[in-house]
Amino acid sequence: MFSVNIKKILLVILASYLASCSIPKTDFEQDQNTLLTIDKGSIIGSNNGNTYQWLGIQYGSIPDSSYRWKRGAETEKWDGVYEALEFGNTCVQKGSLINTTKRRNWGDIVGSEDCLYLNVWAPKDVFDDLSQSKPVMVWIHGGSNVSGNADFYDPSELVSSQDVIVVSINYRLGPFGWFRHPDITSTAQNPEDQSGNYGNIDSIQALEWVQRNIEFFGGDSSNVTIFGESAGGYNVAALLSAKQANGLFHKAIIQSGGIRPGDIEHSESYLEKNLPWKSYSSRELVNELLVMNEMASDRNSAATLQENLSQKEIEALMRNASTAEIYEAYLATKTNTDDMLRPFPDGNLLSELGILGSLESGFNMDVPIMIGTNRDEMKLFLLNNPRLTREFLRIPRIRDLDLWNAVSKHRSNSWKYLAVDEPAQNLTRSGRSNIYAYRFDWDDEPRKYGVDLKNLLGAAHAFEIPFVMGNFDEDALTKYILSRKNMEEVKTLSQSMMSYWAEFAYNGDPDKGREGNLTDWKAWDPGKGREKYIIFDSTHDGGIRMTNDYLTEEKLIEMLATDNKIQDYKWKCEILDAAIMFDHLTTQNVLNDFNNNQCSDLDPSTEWRKYWYDEKEQRY
């Protein structure tokens, strides 16, 4: 997402768009039709008018700090009937729109470490014939692994229209979800606790709960699809290469995610200066705690002290610190406090081969994969760049339309290549025949308040989610993002996407959708000139169609070098450098050789990287 210092009008627009598919805060009443018994006891849910739902079911517990940076404790059995009528605790994070915190608390530390809850939605005919169990789709939310929660999106329309069961899960975030310090992991009693990828371990624990219990809700435990967007997509990819997750799911959907793991060496090292394209360091977090506790006067003395403290002293410091102290230390050690935390190859949960290496080596070979990105992913993240946008009467304006679209195109193409095209091509060449790829191109936003939303946002990051969930709040959307003119086509496109997603969940192949009447979505074919992926767009922009186009590293660099929409060659150098530094597209020497050595005499640190270090305000 992007910063709260973004213009008020854009906040309203985006909040309305994203919140259109969120779950209204309503007091739900018990429905006796939802009374059932699961492994820990009896439970009752509610009827939201469209589906049955059971909210706030605890699948694991973090009862105190002794369980911090460990697998969650098993939940206890209960007496009586558990009322699953409201969502469970939010995991610790900064208050924001995407964790449904009240606006006055945006930027505050909110939530609880004891947050391992999930929610279940089922069609209202689910108990009519329990011999006909339904496919299960487990949603892993996004938010850079530092924010978000399971109650932000409402899957009721997907559930009711496509006859599937959806489970959404919370998982630990930020320094509680991804943290690897030698003095914590060295005394761990099992491989999971040694991992450091605790947010991914939470997902595995939730999937184990699904295997034990989903049949009580009418679901098929032998037909589970995991799907997630952004960081949730990264976490889906990590689960594909985690041996502990083997057999817990049978299909996987990665929406605007990626496969590049985090840097385990960086996470455990001392860093005199954090880099904006890296995640935080556990060593530096401890340094900050030592300063906060007045055990050291500054960072350098803290590093010296840390080296001389025993393992037990370091662990005691970390476990005795309050939730707020841990999080404040974490925020203080990051250049960009909303930079995404990626699962790292710890050798316990995630193989040292990484995600792609694990898949290419044959692990989880039989799991069909759907993977895709949005055409204009990066527009959402570029909005806060004052060199590309300006503010006029509190309304964002594009400074140079050609440059804006060009920068977004090349940065978004880099994402697509690394997250979709490269892994799909490599996996299918290695023998996989069940990789299905897409690109979401819908960009029919109207012009509102003088803002050209079609160009400003287009098919931006996360904008496909309401189409997949199918829940559009017409009052909010027609006022800000959608219009009465395009609403009918939006709903038609959404219905098609839900149908493809559901058919994939049923049979592992999106095919022609549930009704068999849509464009045939074929698997990625690595052959030259063969169809590769499907495009989702409005009818007047080409509609739903297959294409044989795909990206390579060489093509990306050539497209950038020959783009006449970018007049200043320094922008081309910066775009390539960003792809190298942030995305690991290629090696640094490629920048020096780029476009007849145009960039070789430039110093990235003074020409453009200085802008990357600017302190970011809280993203909402």
Regions found by a protein language model. Give the residues of each.
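Sec-dependent signal peptide recognition
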Residues: 5-12
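Non-catalytic accessory segments of hydrolases
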Residues: 2, 21-200, 479-497, 508-514, ...
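Substrate-gating cap/lid region and adjacent catalytic-acid/histidine neighborhood
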Residues: 259-269, 302-489, 500, 507, ...
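Mobile gating loops/cap/lid regions near enzyme active sites that modulate substrate access
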Residues: 383, 425, 429-620
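Hydrophobic h-region of N-terminal signal peptides that target proteins for export
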Residues: 14-22
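Short, solvent-exposed loop/turn elements at domain surfaces
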Residues: 53, 61-68, 327-328, 378-381, ...
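Serine-hydrolase-like catalytic core of hydrolytic proteins
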Residues: 56, 98-308, 348-351, 356-384, ...
